[in-house]
Amino acid sequence: MKVIFVVLAIVLVTLWAMPSEAGKDPKITNKVFFDIEIDNKPAGRIVFGLYGKTVPKTVENFRALCTGEKGLGTSGKPLHYKDSKFHRIIPNFMIQGGDFTRGDGTGGESIYGKKFNDENFKIKHSKPGLLSMANAGPNTNGSQFFITTVVTSWLDGRHTVFGEVIEGMDIVKLLESIGSQSGTPSKIAKISNSGEL
């Protein structure tokens, strides 16, 4: 009986001491970048770390759209973020872009075709600088994304977080400063170049 108690105590202490998976930061598997222009003037670079172990399909979509390696999409436009605009910027909320087909938030497409399903919602919108998929409801992911500028926990379970800003949060803040409550930016902000590091 003593042996069982000792073994049980050791197991419980070991389990208690093990780090929790939920408390860990997601593993960054890829790094990509956006070079930003505001009113045709270089503003700087944002570098993102992508969580490819947690949401591999979503990460592969974004990574490939950063490089443009997939060529033309079903829309006849390049599957590439280069030269696309940030069409919606709301201070104290987020910066949205990725509509390279229409430029106004009504378009975009994924490397898998028009839309793809939500992969999972394991990562929460728990801090500024997170990269998440913009969508029009469940399972409608394309190419549009947003970068949080505050905690946005009300989006948990509705939008897939797949990366974070690892360099250039000052550029994110600069973009945020040209936003409005309606979401219409006061200046033209675009991705002049994008790729993988």
Curated annotation (Swiss-Prot):
Record-annotated PPIase cyclophilin-type domain positions: 33-196
Catalysed reaction, written as an equation: [protein]-peptidylproline (omega=180) = [protein]-peptidylproline (omega=0)
Principal location listed in the UniProt entry: other
Location(s) in or outside the cell: Microsome
Keywords: Endoplasmic reticulum, Isomerase, Microsome, Rotamase, Signal
Known EC number: 5.2.1.8
InterPro entries xrefs: Cyclophilin-like_dom_sf (IPR029000), Cyclophilin-type_PPIase (IPR024936), Cyclophilin-type_PPIase_CS (IPR020892), Cyclophilin-type_PPIase_dom (IPR002130)
GO molecular function: cyclosporin A binding; peptidyl-prolyl cis-trans isomerase activity
Signal peptide: 1-22
Single GO biological process annotation from the record: protein folding
Cellular component annotations (GO), alphabetically ordered: cytoplasm; endoplasmic reticulum; intracellular membrane-bounded organelle
Enzyme class: isomerase
UniProt-recorded name of the protein: Peptidyl-prolyl cis-trans isomerase B
